[in-house]
């Protein structure tokens, strides 16, 4: 069996420690050697980003320059269309073949809205889901049929993610950082410090570009 590949999608507007540090901890917990970050171009489930795709890509490059765990995949940025996870995972599965273990990392908040995602039922055909737990969010889905779906796919053993190519959901005990891109944008607009919220090269770039003002 080939090594588990993990993908981490998002808007990253801007990228911050709340994105990076839980995934770094996750990698240590379950034995990931590489996490591929996939920034959205046009996110279908949330407001459109304030920074353009070139700026968000550059901020990610700055944030991961000294972090060999991470690599960047630009495929969604190159689509002039909504960024659907189901479509991206189908592409990855076709490229990697049927036997490579593949996982998609999401937050617990995203799990609760997962049944609203485009072709959500196909996602576990192509990948596992790794859910980074977040305090304040329930562990149960809102509707019984979705709770049953969760329980049918749930595993408490991260080794299952390495031994099977797709189909499992794993709830990871990762640290929670009370940081969000919304908070960072608001602080920047108010002229407040964000030194401890995101990597210094990213903050320098934001200031140079006059972003989020």
Curated annotation (Swiss-Prot):
Function comment: Catalyzes the reversible adenylation of nicotinate mononucleotide (NaMN) to nicotinic acid adenine dinucleotide (NaAD).
This enzyme's EC code(s) = 2.7.7.18
**InterPro entries, sorted:** Cyt_trans-like (IPR004821), NadD/NMNAT (IPR005248), Rossmann-like_a/b/a_fold (IPR014729)
Cross-referenced Pfam families, in alphabetical order? CTP_transf_like
- Protein name from the UniProt record: Probable nicotinate-nucleotide adenylyltransferase
Q: Which domain of life is it from?
A: Bacteria
Entry keyword set: ATP-binding, NAD, Nucleotide-binding, Nucleotidyltransferase, Pyridine nucleotide biosynthesis, Transferase
| Swiss-Prot/TrEMBL GO biological process terms | NAD biosynthetic process
What family does the entry list? Answer: Belongs to the NadD family.
One GO molecular function term of this record is: ATP binding
Q: In which pathway does it act?
A: Cofactor biosynthesis; NAD(+) biosynthesis; deamido-NAD(+) from nicotinate D-ribonucleotide: step 1/1
Its recorded reaction(s) are: nicotinate beta-D-ribonucleotide + ATP + H(+) = deamido-NAD(+) + diphosphate
PANTHER family found in the cross-reference section: NICOTINATE-NUCLEOTIDE ADENYLYLTRANSFERASE-RELATED (PTHR39321), PHOSPHOPANTETHEINE ADENYLYLTRANSFERASE (PTHR39321:SF3)
């Amino acid at each position: 069996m080939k090594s588990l590949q993990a993908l981490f999608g998002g808007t990253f507007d801007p990228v911050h420690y709340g994105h990076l540090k839980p995934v770094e901890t996750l990698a240590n917990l379950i034995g990931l050697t590489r996490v591929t970050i996939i920034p959205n171009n046009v996110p279908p489930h949330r407001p459109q980003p304030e920074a353009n795709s070139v700026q968000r890509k550059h901020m990610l490059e700055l944030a991961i320059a000294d972090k060999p765990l991470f690599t960047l995949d630009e495929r969604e940025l190159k689509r002039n269309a909504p960024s659907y996870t189901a479509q991206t995972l189908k592409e990855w599965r076709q490229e990697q073949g049927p036997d490579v273990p593949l996982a998609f990392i999401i937050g617990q908040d995203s799990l609760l809205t997962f049944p609203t995602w485009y072709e959500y039922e196909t996602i576990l055909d192509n990948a596992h889901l790794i859910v980074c737990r977040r305090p304040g969010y329930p562990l149960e889905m809102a509707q019984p049929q979705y709770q049953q779906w969760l329980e049918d796919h749930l595993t408490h053993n991260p080794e299952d993610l390495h031994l099977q190519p797709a189909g499992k959901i794993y709830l990871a005990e990762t640290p929670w950082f009370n940081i969000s891109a919304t908070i960072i944008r608001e602080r920047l607009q108010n002229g407040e410090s964000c030194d401890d919220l995101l990597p210094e090269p990213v903050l320098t770039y934001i200031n140079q570009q006059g972003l989020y003002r």
